[in-house]
């Protein structure tokens, strides 16, 4: 496991593993990462409305909705993607991908740390 320093936190990285690339946690760098939700935003350039598709792996639900305005779309003008997940060190995060003028912009959002309350069998999210 590679621990990230303050400057590296939030950066989306991959490590080489037997000819494949493994996504690491954008917060701490741990390589055991699980994706729990995918959100896709389909929008024609500068259109007012877009289609938002959500596949929630933990809840076993898929939703499709028409949205007026930006909603959660990470792109202000076009299509976007948000992957939500966690690492086995407990970090919760989102990875956003947005299109802008031919570029694909990638950023992550730290959502807090999973805290296990084994006495009450609960999982709580704690921010930094």
Task: Report residues per predicted region.
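Cysteine-rich micro-motifs
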Residues: 47-54, 84-92
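Short cysteine-rich clusters marking metal-coordination/redox-active sites
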Residues: 25-29, 87-89
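Short, flexible, mixed-charge glycine/proline-rich loop motifs
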Residues: 10-22, 75-81
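Short, non-ligating residues that shape and space the ligands of small metal-coordination modules
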Residues: 32-35, 93-97
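Short, charged low-complexity linear segments at domain edges
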Residues: 1-9, 45-70
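Short cysteine/histidine-rich metal-coordination sites, predominantly Zn2+-binding motifs
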Residues: 40-52, 102-111
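Structured alpha/beta or helical-core interaction and ligand-binding surfaces enriched in interleaved
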Residues: 24, 34, 39, 54-57
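A short, surface-exposed interaction/processing loop segment used at functional sites
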Residues: 100-128
């Amino acid at each position: 496991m590679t621990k990230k320093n303050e400057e590296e936190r939030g950066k989306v990285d991959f490590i080489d593993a037997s000819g494949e690339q493994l996504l690491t946690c954008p917060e701490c760098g741990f390589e055991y990462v699980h994706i729990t939700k995918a959100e896709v935003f389909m929008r024609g350039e500068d259109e007012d409305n877009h289609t938002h598709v959500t596949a929630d792996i933990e809840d076993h639900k898929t939703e499709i909705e028409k949205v007026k305005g930006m909603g959660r779309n990470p792109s202000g003008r076009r299509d976007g993607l948000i992957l939500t997940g966690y690492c086995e060190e407990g970090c919760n995060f989102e990875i956003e991908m947005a299109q802008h003028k031919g570029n694909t912009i990638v950023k992550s959002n730290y959502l807090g740390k999973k805290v296990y309350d084994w006495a009450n069998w609960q999982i709580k999210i704690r921010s930094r």
